[in-house]
Amino acid sequence: MRIELLNTPADALETRFEEQIRPIRMLDFAGQQRLTDNLRVFISAAKMRGDALDHVLLSGPPGLGKTTLAHIIAAEMGSSIKATSGPLLDKAGNLAGLLTGLQKGDVLFIDEIHRMPPAVEEYLYSAMEDFRIDIMLDSGPSARAVQLRIEPFTLVGATTRSGLLTSPLRARFGINSRFDYYSADLLEKIIIRASGILGIGVDQDAAAEIAGRSRGTPRIANRLLRRARDFAQVADAPLITRSIAMTTLDCLEIDEEGLDDMDKKIMDTIVNKFSGGPVGAASLAVSVGEEQDTIEEVYEPYLIQAGYIARTPRGRVATRRALLRFSVQESRGDGPLFEFPLEDDQRQ
């Protein structure tokens, strides 16, 4: 049985754990320094004016702290927060109920906002710009629109795929902030802090080892820490040492660069089955037995960041670094790798 620890979504138990270790003030939020510095200025200015903060769009790979920052924004504004997700807002009435229940200055947090149905999304336009919504009553010849005023509020939207947002929705966010992957040093500090909350010590070398294999993602670092805690408790060890951390990571088959079994399967497929690419996302998903959306949203961003995959108009291609590591034939490194122009997001 394959254990996919790195890339699985947060479950209920993990969500409760994240709530326990979640910082509640901007000064306690580790990383994303420029982003948080700017937000502090915007929040302070809004409070000085007595206005609601401009609507905020938080984008970036999963597990980097978008939900945490949404709660911090509400806390810094001294406001309440209502949280939901795009897939749950399947009817306009669900959104209308949330909007009409907001008090002045409240924060409405919509996770996975790119998955909100277009018909529901359109209700947000007037709510975000004019703080009103138009509700249709009855149907057919007797149908009529009723305009409801709502209190000024701040919408915080989180997305892992900002490119899927419609232009009208994206244009209504006054603050657009993108999350970057974390450095190993920052992850090490996050691990040490979380270990104190878990009630088990971790030495510096162990924290560094876990941080180095966490793919630049705090959520993954915390998952690995919890698994290392399990190994330490079974071994009746009062402290997570480097030896225990190494045993944990080896048993979970997570290598020095944080790649797990599925990452390696994806790379092996591109390099050896498709001769380095290009290969389309749909073909790749079928070959590895994974959903296309999961490939694009969960696995691919880190593989691109790590320099193993490049995206082109004709599909994914393996880089020379990938060929050197994953090719079963040394001669594979001689093939043309970048015949096609890179997409815009690869130039950044």
UniProtKB/Swiss-Prot annotation:
**SUPFAM superfamilies in the record, alphabetically?**
P-loop containing nucleoside triphosphate hydrolases, Winged helix' DNA-binding domain
Give the subcellular location: Cytoplasm
Primary enzyme class: hydrolase
- Binding sites annotated in the UniProt record for ATP: I21, R22, G63, K66, T67, T68, E129, D130, F131, R172, Y182, R219
Q: Where is this region: Small ATPAse domain (RuvB-S)?
A: 183-253
Binding residues for DNA? R311, R316
Positions contributing to Mg(2+) binding: T67
Keyword entries, A-Z: ATP-binding, Cytoplasm, DNA damage, DNA recombination, DNA repair, DNA-binding, Hydrolase, Nucleotide-binding
Q: Which reaction does it catalyse?
A: ATP + H2O = ADP + phosphate + H(+)
Identify the main location.
cytoplasm
Q: What is known of its domains?
A: Has 3 domains, the large (RuvB-L) and small ATPase (RuvB-S) domains and the C-terminal head (RuvB-H) domain. The head domain binds DNA, while the ATPase domains jointly bind ATP, ADP or are empty depending on the state of the subunit in the translocation cycle. During a single DNA translocation step the structure of each domain remains the same, but their relative positions change.
List the HAMAP family: DNA_HJ_migration_RuvB
Q: What is this protein called?
A: Holliday junction branch migration complex subunit RuvB
Q: From what organism does this protein derive? A: Chlorobium limicola (strain DSM 245 / NBRC 103803 / 6330)
